[in-house]
């Protein structure tokens, strides 16, 4: 690229670090602004589908990721009361054969650590809390909590559902989804019957569900359980939940679920919020990504995956067009990502119970393979190929205008 824009990334979560790793590989000048003073083991498990794993492999992180992840053999939907198997979608080798990349489950902190090792440490600014951004003709002014100000050619909001950068584009507010999720981590040795074979298990009830899967290379089992809630409380990853309240909410469920809940020392509670899709993520010098752009409910397990796709797309566009046409880069990124993430957001609101709708009993193996192939719109998406194709088309259009 000719000319390297100074890209300021606000937020060093999965979205921000993924973009920083992309920009580092592309040689794009950037910095990362994170309000925390240090990175810590926050959050629970996360599912990484082939559409995101493919991107992470492209960043050269295949070995590091495999070392900390687990590789579930299948996604099982089971009955809440008697643990009867309702449906099964193969993952493992079948998923890799179909989509060219594995399906992983990983602790969020482990994924974050892998990404943190892939970024330029000199570009990382901790204790840097951005409180406002002001776009001007020639740059963007960033205002910090300590009263200082800085300027950047491009600012990317990777700062989550309460994004400061998003507030410069729209006045909308997060929407409470009417429930909460309680998350926990349990040593695999405490629940050997769930750890013996690596699986994603989802127990579906009428108004709640519980899902669990291995993380930390199989040493831990991560679980999340939904609970109804009439009003919003905390949205923090670090809010402590109530073990007794959770156990009461799942009283009468099968022994696998109640035993898993009882085995957790501490649980965290996170109230569910999202936002309606918006058509505009960018201006001349601002862009949104991840939860700042498209916060979604966790029921499709694609929030982090879509943030990683965002990172590849935005990184490729900035690397290609540079300072000569930042606006072109941001518009192209927006055009590629808004329709896809809006579709994922909409599907995420349906909830996991839909996975059990084909039947109440498990069908033949072919049914599972069909379910795996039905996920092609998600797992089969190649963000790198989509970005390359769009960049070629944009270059052709620009060349025609110049001629």
Give, region by region, the residue ranges found by the protein language model:
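Conserved mid-domain beta->alpha element of the FAD-binding
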Residues: 8, 12-37, 156-157, 182, ...
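Conserved N-terminal helical subregion
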Residues: 2-7, 49-187, 230-247, 381-403
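Short glycine/proline- and charge-enriched loop/turn segments
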Residues: 34-37, 91-98, 228-233, 348-351, ...
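Conserved N-terminal glycine-rich FAD pyrophosphate-binding loop of Rossmann-like flavoproteins
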Residues: 38-54
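A short coil-to-beta-strand element that immediately follows conserved catalytic motifs
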Residues: 176-177, 195-199, 255-271
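Active-site substrate-recognition segment that forms the wall
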Residues: 198-232, 243, 250, 272
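C-terminal helical "tail/cap" subdomain of flavin- and related membrane-associated enzymes
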Residues: 2-5, 67, 259, 300-301, ...
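Short gly/ser/thr-rich secondary-structure transition/capping motifs
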Residues: 124, 138-140, 204, 267-276
């Amino acid at each position: 690229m000719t000319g390297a824009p100074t890209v300021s990334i606000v937020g060093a979560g999965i979205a921000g670090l993924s973009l920083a790793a992309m920009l580092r590989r592309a040689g794009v000048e950037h910095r990362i602004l994170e309000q925390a003073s240090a990175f810590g083991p926050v959050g629970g498990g996360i599912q990484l589908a082939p559409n995101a794993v493919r991107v992470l492999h492209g960043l050269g992180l295949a070995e590091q990721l495999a070392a900390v992840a687990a590789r579930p053999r299948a996604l099982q939907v089971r009955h809440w009361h008697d643990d009867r198997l309702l449906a099964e979608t193969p993952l493992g080798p079948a998923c890799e054969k179909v989509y060219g990349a594995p399906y992983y489950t990983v602790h969020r902190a482990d994924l974050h650590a892998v990404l943190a090792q892939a970024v330029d440490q000199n570009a990382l600014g901790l204790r840097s809390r951005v409180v406002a951004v002001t776009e001007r003709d020639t740059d963007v002014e960033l205002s910090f909590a300590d009263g200082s100000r800085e300027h950047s050619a491009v600012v990317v909001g990777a700062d989550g559902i309460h994004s400061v950068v998003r507030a410069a584009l729209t006045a909308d507010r997060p929407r409470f989804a009417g429930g909460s999720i309680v998350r926990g981590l349990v040593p695999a040795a405490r629940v050997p019957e769930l750890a013996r074979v690596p699986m994603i298990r989802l127990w579906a009830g009428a108004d709640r569900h519980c899902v669990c899967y291995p993380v930390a290379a199989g040493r831990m089992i991560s679980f999340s359980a939904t609970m109804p809630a009439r009003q919003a409380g905390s949205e923090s990853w670090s809010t402590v939940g109530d073990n007794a309240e959770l156990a009461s909410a799942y009283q009468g469920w099968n022994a696998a679920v109640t035993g898993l809940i009882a085995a957790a020392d501490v649980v965290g509670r996170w109230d569910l919020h999202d936002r309606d899709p918006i058509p505009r993520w960018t201006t001349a010098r601002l862009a949104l990504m991840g939860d700042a752009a498209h916060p979604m409910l966790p029921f499709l397990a694609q929030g982090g995956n879509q943030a990683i796709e965002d990172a590849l797309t935005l990184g490729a566009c900035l690397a290609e067009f540079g300072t000569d046409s930042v606006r072109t880069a941001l518009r192209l990124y927006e055009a590629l990502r808004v329709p896809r993430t809006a579709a994922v957001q909409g599907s995420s609101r349906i909830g996991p119970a839909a996975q059990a709708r084909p039947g109440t009993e498990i069908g033949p193996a072919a049914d599972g393979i069909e379910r795996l192939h039905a996920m092609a719109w998600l797992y089969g998406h190649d963000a790198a190929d989509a970005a390359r194709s769009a960049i070629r088309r944009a270059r052709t259009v620009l060349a025609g205008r110049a001629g």
